[in-house]
Amino acid sequence: MTSAELKHLLDEAEKSPRQIAAAVSGLPEKILRYQPAPGKWSILEILAHLVDIEILYAYRMRQMLADKNPTIAPIDQDDWARNLGYLESVPAELVALYGLNRHYNLRLLRRLTPEDLEKSAFHPERQARVTVADYVGMLSGHGSNHLAQIERLKKEAR
């Protein structure tokens, strides 16, 4: 990954918390809790997921940067949504936590060297190694993917 590619991905990642905050600002509970089908996430669950995955990515990237030959522990994001109280969350807190965690991750990522970006961990679900650079790419696109999902849910719920 070139320094220009890294800068572009991090600049995109920086926009996400503001975009998510704007998309959910002032939404009534009915829309925040609307589920398009059984087992499909509401906007509230998406917000909680964004926070948890930001924390998860933070941990995984730090493992790669600091530990010797780490292995990533897989998760089931639907189990997390069901078992971690996503529907009992406070939307404004989730928006704030997402922004703060993203900010903290970006502070770390902006000071990495090209060698740091190639540090890796074994991902058992993929049966392959993944790098910090791979996670930068995932982090950069994660919020925008869910922003599109939030916009669709807002239209469906009205």
What are these language model-derived features?
Residues 4-11, 35, 67, 88-89, ...:
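Solvent-exposed interaction patches of small proteins and small membrane subunits
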Residues 23, 27-30, 68, 112-115, ...:
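A short secondary-structure junction motif
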Residues 33-77, 106, 118-158:
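Short, contiguous alpha-helical
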Residues 5, 12, 38, 42, ...:
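Alpha-helix N-cap/loop-to-helix boundary motif
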Residues 2-29, 51-59, 63, 137-141:
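Alpha-helical bundle segments that constitute or directly flank the non-heme di-iron/ferroxidase center
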